[in-house]
Amino acid sequence: MASSIWKGLVGIGLFALAHAAFSAAQHRSYMRLTEKEDETLPIDIVLQTLLAFIVACYGIVHIAGEFKDMDATSELRNKTFDTLRNHPSFYVFNHRGRVMFQPPESEDCHRNQAPFSSNSSLKLSKLEAMHR
């Protein structure tokens, strides 16, 4: 868990950045009123912006924790070859392969039974609807 000191440092940095943005907007509106639009920002606003950005970034780096290596070898060192590309969450057992690759004799039985059962149930439902 990140220390509250670093979180406070990030808060101070973000507050200082917001203050610098407000100061820059206020300075710009003042320059418009005095019709001196070609002047740059004062050095104190520029320095406050840079310092606040550095403080906020420094605090964020400490809150983030340990960085990982850019090399993938450190991650792959702990995995075996079997588990390297093994994603069990992508396994699908309920697919059309069971029906497509059945032996021919079992396909005929299912084909012959399916129309009769659906037709008979359809006829029965029509008859029941007519009697009501």
Swiss-Prot record:
Subcellular localization: Endoplasmic reticulum membrane; Golgi apparatus membrane; Early endosome membrane
TM regions (residue ranges): 4-22, 44-63
Keywords: Endoplasmic reticulum, Endosome, Golgi apparatus, Magnesium, Membrane, Transmembrane, Transmembrane helix, Transport
GO CC field: early endosome; early endosome membrane; EMC complex; endoplasmic reticulum membrane; Golgi apparatus; Golgi membrane; membrane; plasma membrane
Segments on the Cytoplasmic side according to the record's topology features: 1-3, 64-132
UniProt KW Transmembrane keyword: yes
Cited Pfam families: MMgT
Bilayer topology annotation: Multi-pass membrane protein
The name this protein goes by in its record: ER membrane protein complex subunit 5-B
Biological source species: Xenopus laevis
